[in-house]
Amino acid sequence: MTRVADFAKDHRVHLLQGAQELFPALIEAMDAALSDIQFETYIFDFTGAGAQVAEALIRAAQRGVRTHLVVDGVGTGPLPKAWQQRMKSAGVQVRVYSPLGPLGLLLPHRWRRLHRKLCVVDGLVVFCGGINVLDDLYDPNYGDLDAPRFDFAVQATGSLAAQASRTMELLWWRMQAVRDVRLNRLPQAVRDLRA
């Protein structure tokens, strides 16, 4: 494990307040992506400003950028069909972390959730913090809000981005291995874990 002090030598950090600062920075980075985008979030809501982030992922995939999106099975739930189709057609690879089965959260092994809010672009820049992909002035359960949410994220460059990228890649392949096991593709699951 890399010590925190090791990161301080080669990284730059910029504090972003709310989605009104985070989303434009995210979109700018994704629009400039050359090789890959890794994105993980608990909530991805496709209303308002969240739709702009989704559009940036689609544009990147259409340019040939490897685009991975992981959303939580409770926080996001099933993606809207229209967005699912658009992302699939564009080449955005989407995985749902621990989707709910017929028994929902009654089974304790379903309580583990993906609360990370991370995006790594080209292994060079990482966005992380407490902000979901959710318009600051809209709540899916309550509608329009009177005031924006108060939350923060950081944009960082340097070795911290590469470390986050490796961690996200590991989750991606673990999820693929679990999927392969469920589909009785054990040899492929073993290969996925070695990737």
Model-predicted regions and their roles:
Residues M1-A195:
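Charged, low-complexity intrinsically disordered terminal segments
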